[in-house]
């Protein structure tokens, strides 16, 4: 969901809907989506007066006031749309995944401008495309003024082989620099912390990472710490500590899953708060 003024905006099947956040009354105004999600995990994104909604193999933009469609992007390779739709400086960034297929799945940057206001199903073309075998599963980007930081799956979509973490030129999508995880794909969004001037993420191989990157987008250091279990959780960083979800030994209640709290100065796990189940969400 997204909060837009007094309303909660959400998807239901092939419809974009909204309800009053105070009363719960559903608005009679409904947006028509160009498709549905076979696996809907990411919420809609609200930015620049628009709502951006993912469907299988594509993204659709709606007017946030009228819920009328503005344009549609249909990815040429397709796949699950399970990566966050990230907005920055007039563009959205998102990826697609044909899990374990070995296809060169695509991560795209799309200028959100509605070039043809008279057409509601205008087909959008991406500003640039970056490809990766086995794609982008829950992986979200972070953009600076000059470059984009992004993680992804490894080619075999497993938890043991290293996966790439890249910096991309913000205007062209060309690779500036590349590093690799200890093991497993990156299924979190990249977090940036101003106090430490560093980027943080996790891998489903069970590691927490800290990357330092210079102004040109080159990696200067990549540190990692073992979490004791898989993590797809986007790090929340506050007051010198990072908080991430970690999987335990199974899917039953209280099997070792936890929220791990990492002290960033010592770069060690300060403690773990046990949870009933695996806090698996990317957010």
Question: Positions of the model-derived regions?
Answer:
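Short loop/turn segments that connect beta-strands within beta-propeller blades
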Residues: 20-24, 63-67, 111-115, 168-173, ...
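A short beta-strand motif characteristic of beta-propeller blades
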Residues: 25-35, 68-74, 118-131, 174-180, ...
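Repeat-blade elements of multi-bladed beta-propeller folds
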Residues: 1-15, 35-59, 80-108, 133-165, ...
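Ankyrin-repeat and related helical/solenoid repeat scaffolds used for protein-protein interactions
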Residues: 260, 265-275, 280-283
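Glycine-rich phosphate/oxyanion-binding loops and their immediately adjacent helices
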Residues: 202, 220-221, 245-246, 262-265, ...
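Hydrophobic residues in beta-strands and at strand termini
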Residues: 18-19, 32, 61, 75, ...
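Sequence-structural signature of mature extracellular/luminal beta-sheet repeat domains
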Residues: 15, 116-117
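Kelch-like beta-propeller repeat domains
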Residues: 162, 175-180, 185, 206-212, ...
């Amino acid at each position: 969901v997204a909060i837009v003024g007094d309303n909660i905006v959400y998807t239901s099947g092939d419809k974009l809907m909204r309800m009053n956040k105070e009363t719960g009354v559903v608005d009679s105004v409904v947006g028509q989506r160009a498709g549905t999600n076979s696996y809907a995990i990411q919420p809609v994104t609200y930015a620049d007066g628009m709502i951006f909604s993912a469907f299988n193999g594509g993204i659709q933009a709606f007017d946030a006031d009228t819920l009328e469609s503005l344009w549609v992007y249909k990815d040429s390779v397709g796949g699950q749309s399970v990566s966050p739709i990230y907005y920055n400086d007039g563009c959205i960034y998102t990826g697609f995944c044909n899990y374990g297929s070995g296809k060169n799945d695509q991560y795209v940057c799309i200028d959100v401008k509605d070039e043809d206001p008279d057409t509601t199903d205008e087909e959008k073309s991406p500003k640039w495309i970056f490809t990766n075998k086995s794609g982008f599963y829950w992986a979200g980007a972070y953009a600076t003024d000059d470059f984009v930081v992004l993680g992804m799956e490894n080619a075999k979509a497993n938890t043991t082989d290293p996966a790439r973490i890249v910096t991309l030129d913000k205007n062209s999508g060309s690779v500036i620099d590349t590093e690799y995880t200890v093991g497993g794909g990156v299924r979190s969004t990249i977090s940036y912390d101003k106090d430490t001037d560093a980027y943080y993420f996790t891998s489903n191989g069970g590691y927490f990472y800290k990357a330092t990157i210079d102004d040109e987008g080159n990696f200067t250091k990549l540190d990692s710490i073992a979490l004791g279990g898989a993590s797809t959780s986007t790090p929340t960083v506050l007051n010198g500590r990072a908080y991430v979800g970690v999987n335990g030994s199974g899917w039953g209640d209280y099997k070792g899953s936890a929220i791990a709290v990492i002290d960033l100065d010592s770069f060690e796990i300060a403690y773990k708060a046990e949870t009933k189940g695996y806090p698996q969400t990317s957010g």
